[in-house]
Amino acid sequence: MLPTIITDIECLVTRPDRHNLVTVVVRTDKGITGYGCATFQQRPLAVKAMVDEYLKPLLVGRDANHIEDLWHMMMVNAYWRNGPVINNAVAGVDMALWDIKGKLADMPLYHLFGGKSRDAIAAYSHAASDTLDGLYQDVERLYTQGYRHIRCQLGFYGGNPDTLHSTRQPTEGAYYDQDQYMANTIAMFRALREKYGDRFHILHDVHERLFPNQAVQFAKAVEVYRPYFIEDILPPAQNEWLAQIRSQSAVPLATGELFNNPAEWQNLVINRQIDFIRCHVSQIGGITPALKLGAFCQNFGVRLAWHCPPDMTPIGAAVNIHLNIHLHNAAIQEFVAYPENTRKVFPQAVEPENGYLYPIERSGIGVGIDLDAARQFPVVYRPHEWTQSRLPDGTMHTP
């Protein structure tokens, strides 16, 4: 096979709507351009610097065909590895290289991987409100759109406490009360089942807001309401507690969006302490490690539910679709509708049809970026108040 030489790499940060989105563009001497998602929205300029200052000089002039070799070189070239900045930067290039390979072969990615395992992947979206009546409206809107898996949150992560027993002069932050959150969320599950029965699957994201002993209590309490899964019931640093939760509750557990390093998931998968893995594909380094992770999890009965929040590009979401159509143990795909400006910047963005995401038949990833439109929306820093999470006494807690 003739070489396909990398001639240029560009990293573009754009903020068309609420989130800063990072896209890597790889150009070649064959006139074929690849696109990848490298979004780390809290630190986008750090990723851009990694691509522009370090990966571009390393890769320009090399053969884009050798993805496996280039991935390993990018990952180890700095010696220190497997962190959110380097992994997202590597992932953006990795996805773009796979995009180029698919375009060279004139095949969509899922065909390049080996073809499909299913006709479509079930999607779930988010219903949230401060009140049950508002939540019901959101649920019914999504149900009418065809969703049969709906993530339900009463209030934002950690709930919105009706009353907060706060200190005299509270430090600025996003406050929540764990006890109120548990009580309100258990009541939410009960109300949803009483109103809707089993018409749809309920998912819920704890988002690491509980201490380990509270997580055990919560899992036992919600099991009777048959959630499809409970997400991030613990922060990664406390995942050894999953064995205790497992021993006391059959509630399905999902985790992984914060994982960077294979060491963070290997024992959880081998010991079958989770049911679904929720890795963020760019956070673990791109398509190359995601394919290996999928095959590894299949050996232990762990299913795939890739993280797909609104703070990633439609390019990254399309990569998830290709992985899910191909990988046999894919279970479900998160999806949040794109705002108008995001669709303008990514005009090929894919959306569900009656609750399913279908294969993308265009060559490569099948979703690119309108560079002129993207440049109309420059990066804007924001302090990300929701990650400044505090308990009633002012203690900072995992967001």
From Swiss-Prot:
Report whether Disulfide bond shows up as a keyword of the record: no
- Which keywords, in A-to-Z order, does the entry hold? Magnesium, Metal-binding
The protein's GO terms of the molecular function aspect are:
magnesium ion binding
| A biological-process GO annotation | amino acid catabolic process
Q: How is this protein named in the record? A: D-galactonate dehydratase family member PC1_4063
Family annotation (Pfam families)? MR_MLE_C, MR_MLE_N
Please tell me where Mg(2+) binds in this chain.
Answer: D205, E231, E257
SUPFAM superfamilies linked = Enolase C-terminal domain-like, Enolase N-terminal domain-like
Which amino acids does the record list as binding D-arabinonate?
H207, E257, R278, H307, E334
Domain of life of the organism encoding this protein = Bacteria
Q: Which PANTHER family is this protein grouped with?
A: D-GALACTONATE DEHYDRATASE-RELATED (PTHR48080), STARVATION-SENSING PROTEIN RSPA (PTHR48080:SF6)
Query: Which InterPro entries does the record cross-reference, listed alphabetically?
Result: D-mannonate_dehydratase-like, DgoD-like, Enolase-like_C_sf, Enolase-like_N, Enolase_C-like, Mandel_Rmase/mucon_lact_enz_CS, Mandelate_racemase_C, Mandelate_racemase_N_dom
What family name appears in the similarity comment?
Belongs to the mandelate racemase/muconate lactonizing enzyme family. GalD subfamily.
Q: What is the lineage of its organism?
A: Bacteria, Pseudomonadati, Pseudomonadota, Gammaproteobacteria, Enterobacterales
